[in-house]
Amino acid sequence: MLTMFKVEIVQLPKKVLRQKSKNVNIPLNKTNIELAEKMIYHIDDSQGPNTKFRPGVGVAAVQYGILKNVFYVCVPNDSRLTQRDSSQEVKPEDKYLFRDVIFNPEVIWKSDEMVAISQGEGCLSVDESWPNQEGLVRRHMEIKVKGYSYFQKKEMIWHVKGYVAIVFQHELDHLNGMLFIDRIDPKRLWDKSGIKVL
């Protein structure tokens, strides 16, 4: 049933990626429910063995050209992630470190401690051939975000750490018209001073 969704990712240099998104009304209408289901279908399928999509762990509505404050994060409980990220408290039976569509997300707290992924970040909206993608992307190690949970059908606050916090901040940037390449400092591309590297 979910395969009816047509997925077209907006990529640089499209200007919509540089625009700020706007909050949506709660309760969700049919259009926003369909948007959430499209995001779930797209990213979940992208993590499968026979996917036609570029693999991803998150997507923001603006990446479909839709300026709405909503993103989906689906981070599998992958031993390659958890072994290098000791901040995650993961039970072996948990399939995901995090999985939900969040509407109207707002950061209400962030840690002073900073973190980055050792090989840098990537993005579905930034083609792999786009220049100046190499370098550490500095993020807050922990953040608290409030918003509306699609799966729980209520307002919630999430306290996320490590890799999941990085993914959250990557998607939150999209909602503010920013991309990960904006956060790479060309003067210290791989400088690890003052940050934890995963």
UniProtKB/Swiss-Prot annotation:
GO terms for biological process: co-translational protein modification; translation. Its cofactor is Fe(2+). InterPro entries: Peptide_deformylase (IPR023635), Peptide_deformylase_sf (IPR036821). It comes from the Bacteria. Binds 1 Fe(2+) ion. The keyword Metal-binding applies. Fe cation binds at residues 123, 170, 174. It catalyses: N-terminal N-formyl-L-methionyl-[peptide] + H2O = N-terminal L-methionyl-[peptide] + formate. GO terms for molecular function: metal ion binding; peptide deformylase activity. Keywords: Hydrolase, Iron, Metal-binding, Protein biosynthesis. The active site is at residue 171. Its EC number is 3.5.1.88. It holds the Pfam family Pep_deformylase. Belongs to the polypeptide deformylase family. Removes the formyl group from the N-terminal Met of newly synthesized proteins. Requires at least a dipeptide for an efficient rate of reaction. N-terminal L-methionine is a prerequisite for activity but the enzyme has broad specificity at other positions. This is Peptide deformylase. It comes from Mycoplasmopsis pulmonis (strain UAB CTIP).
